[in-house]
UniProtKB/Swiss-Prot annotation:
Adaptor protein complex 3 (AP-3) is a heterotetramer composed of two large adaptins (delta-type subunit AP3D1 and beta-type subunit AP3B1 or AP3B2), a medium adaptin (mu-type subunit AP3M1 or AP3M2) and a small adaptin (sigma-type subunit APS1 or AP3S2). AP-3 associates with the BLOC-1 complex. Interacts with KIF3A; interaction is direct; interaction is impaired by pyrophosphorylation of AP3B1. Residues 705-722, 730-741, 775-788 have a biased composition (Low complexity). Residues 760-774, 811-824 have a biased composition (Basic and acidic residues). Residues 1-26, 271-292, 668-824 are annotated as: Disordered. It comes from Mus musculus (Mouse). It holds the Pfam family Adaptin_N. Transmembrane segments: none annotated. PANTHER family: ADAPTOR COMPLEX SUBUNIT BETA FAMILY MEMBER. It comes from the Eukaryota. Residues 750-759 have a biased composition (Basic residues). InterPro entries: AP3_beta (IPR026740), AP3B1/2_C (IPR056314), AP3B1_Ser (IPR029394), AP3B_C (IPR029390), AP_beta (IPR026739), ARM-like (IPR011989), ARM-type_fold (IPR016024), B-adaptin_app_sub_C (IPR015151). Belongs to the adaptor complexes large subunit family. This is AP-3 complex subunit beta-1. Residues 679-704, 789-799 have a biased composition (Acidic residues).
Amino acid sequence: MSSNSFAYNEQSGGGEAAELGQEATSTISPSGAFGLFSSDWKKNEDLKQMLESNKDSAKLDAMKRIVGMIAKGKNASELFPAVVKNVASKNIEIKKLVYVYLVRYAEEQQDLALLSISTFQRALKDPNQLIRASALRVLSSIRVPIIVPVMMLAIKEASADLSPYVRKNAAHAIQKLYSLDPEQKEMLIEVIEKLLKDKSTLVAGSVVMAFEEVCPDRIDLIHRNYRKLCNLLVDVEEWGQVVIIHMLTRYARTQFVSPWREDGGLEDNEKNFYESEEEEEEKEKSSRKKSYAMDPDHRLLIRNTKPLLQSRNAAVVMAVAQLYWHISPKSEAGVISKSLVRLLRSNREVQYIVLQNIATMSIERKGMFEPYLKSFYVRSTDPTMIKTLKLEILTNLANEANISTLLREFQTYVRSQDKQFAAATIQTIGRCATSISEVTDTCLNGLVCLLSNRDEIVVAESVVVIKKLLQMQPAQHGEIIRHMAKLLDSITVPVARASILWLIGENCERVPKIAPDVLRKMAKSFTSEDDLVKLQILNLAAKLYLTNSKQTKLLTQYILNLGKYDQNYDIRDRTRFIRQLIVPNEKSGALSKYAKKIFLAPKPAPLLESPFKDRDRFQLGTLSHTLNIKASGYLELSNWPEVAPDPSVRNVEVIESAKEWTPLGKTKKEKPMKKFYSESEEEEDEDEDEDEEEEEKEDEDENPSDSSSDSESGSGSESGDTGTEDSSEDSSSGQDSETGSQAEAERQKVAKRNSKTKRKSDSENREKKNENSKASESSSEESSSMEDSSSESESESGSDSEPAPRNVAPAKERKPQQERHPPSKDVFLLDLDDFNPVSTPVALPTPALSPSLIADLEGLNLSTSSSVINVSTPVFVPTKTHELLHRMHGKGLAAHYCFPRQPCIFSDKMVSVQITLTNTSDRKIENIHIGGKGLPVGMQMHAFHPIDSLEPKGSVTVSVGIDFCDSTQTASFQLCTKDDCFNVTLQPPVGELLSPVAMSEKDFKKEQGTLTGMNETSATLIAAPQNFTPSMILQKVVNVANLGAVPSSQDNVHRFAARTVHSGSLMLVTVELKEGSTAQLIINTEKTVIGSVLLRELKPVLSQG
């Protein structure tokens, strides 16, 4: 509710008050003239009158004004008696606002709130869920020990409420009750255990928060709910996600073994490069013993939290980042760096927390943030706290490669008007000089130049840093010490003056003429110096007395006498100590003999370390990490267990709603090819296949025209796995759409009777398909050229499998023992047929887009784990090529690449890329191969075999496989010849990271329903109506992305589906035509980044004419 509406309500409320006669006069009284400076005893009197009115409209306006006052921060506690009377109002709007008020003031007005406790208890049974929840909130806000039993009973009832909103408030009330009476812990744990089993995303975050507050050590409550929480995480509210992620981070550190063992082993191998054979053998044995396999539940948590790195909530991104930092393998933690850098565009408070965490991470793993070095450059608008943190990160990321760039950047910072920032920059330069020995002299010379700066603070800080640097190489910088001695007359900052005196004292033997003169000047100004400087004057006098007593003996005695009567007791104490140590007398002991060794002992150079070095002991993103001190309520991360606890504790019993899918699960277990055709199965098949053949004959007699449709649908089942129920269901669904309802019912009964029976129906469908394919070939000769080409492609796809069904048909009737061989041959041929696009690439785009071919291609699918979503052949293969290496840069060698949209023969997770190499020079090019690979983390590449030679004007095409990890990152590698190596980059279009799938409209809608919220992106398209024809939409979509067409029962909705090549995540694209010349483009996918990129590419293509 905005402030404007509140103002309006106040005006309207005043108007109603005038109608009710509460305004005595319109004139301003003398006391009212001073209302700003004195409290009026009739304050809010009009609101009280309105609340006691008989009109609901007056009460409602009064409550709106009161809630408005609360929102503005005004005190409305004196209205509590008038408001609480309306808690039993029959008007639902008034009742809601009353509860909002009571939640705010129930704790302050406990006695009055207790008078209405019976009303609150009745409200817990109210049919409106908001009232039930509000009543529970008010009860838990009273905070009186006497009503603890009432609250406990209310929480138990609310935890079983049908409304998830009420159950959410029950979880909130648990924390309040626990803080009021910790003795209720055991009973509250029972409620928490019950709510943890809740499937609602609305409840998950709140109950985990209650768990963290009440019983964070009861990890056993999380075991059975672990996987559910991981899967619900994406759909939970943002602040609930933060709580759940932090809890699961602690859980993972107690239940899984460390994933860093493997990384540590690799680092050891890198350190010990030259080793003996015995050491290598020992390491091989130890590596076998320490082989690490990540727990599937551990991987589930890491995988399900990764999409949340794209969250708009900075706290969620930070929570995921700390989870990856603390529990993921080191090789995978790099994915968080980009998301954290993105948060630096937020407000300064968010920047401060994020930069603190990056500073801690950059100490251990510099490589994570080196690519984003420029993101940490200081801006003029940054506050000082942000500037110093960015300096800290830049210092941590400094190395030999980038130090020259950073020093130029620091040189600019030193001139800043912000003196605190300039001083911090000088400290940073000193740290870089100590950590990188190659630039120590350069930094020292630069700091010496700063000694002539006009700003005294800059000079003083430079002196302090130079003092620390000179401790590292004291014998080489006598000139610098002399120069600093001259600055004593101009520098007034105590720390700088003390540092110069300390340096001269340490190096008094190297500057024998300057040191006594400096002591003489300091003796003159001793009484006016700062205490810190006085202490260093005493030290300088003692060191000169021990090394050059002839010149400085009287000066030293004079200074010691001044120190003896100084006002500061530390200086008086130091004076007495030094006098007894350096001036021998009768009472002085043997210690004075070693005075020179004591004062002039070599001091170790100071270590300039990062202030964030020790913060890694705290969990990232916590208050303790920010303050660098253990805060109240902080829960420490436990160490990784040596042996993982039993993972079976996370197993959950099968829920009843999943029982109908049990047969599918059983058939999937029988899928392996080795035990596909056993003798026992053949015997069972003989009995049931006879029944199946009779049913098929009856269907043919009733519907003789169905054979053609059966053959078409059967083509889809041929490309699937014939030993599973999945493919049989696909084929039967294609037949049932053509036959009558009787045939459909009969087929479903047969399917339920035994999944093996359906295998036989598949073979019969294949037999019918072979007979009809001949008819389709003869009819295709008489059709147009477009239909001719499409029918040829159909006949080619079916011709490979023709011999197998011909051998199967007689085997069914008389020779069951021979069934073993033809089906296995059929499956093997189908497996080979999966790669048809390799040998027969589509050259003409127009016939490839014909509707008849698309309808046939919908049935073709590869055998996958899903029974309804299978990979299909591409609808269209673009012929566009991209330049990889220009002939001028390649010294005559030119390279172009394209994406053939075919399965990669090297790996299922790789994208196939065809590279055409051409020799445009007049000489032979020898030994063409792929050299070094600069691939991002996780990306893999399978190179082509080296080409011995390429004749002039010759050309050759090779295939490589690249696993892009479902990202559009460029793959950088070297294309080498015998004499040269050329750096090339290959960036895939997002549409080529997909493989098309075939699925029904029902399955499409089902999967789309699960991919909503953050997994859905949409855009509105505007174009001429002629651009929204089905053929145009199909052509444009498949030209941009490798998507499969999904049949649609609606003319104005076009659907396309694919899977990402690497992870197999579904990519669902919907183009819904609206009225006029607009359309809605919707993309549903777990890969939100790829989905948004694909949306940006499809939108202009579909919008243009």
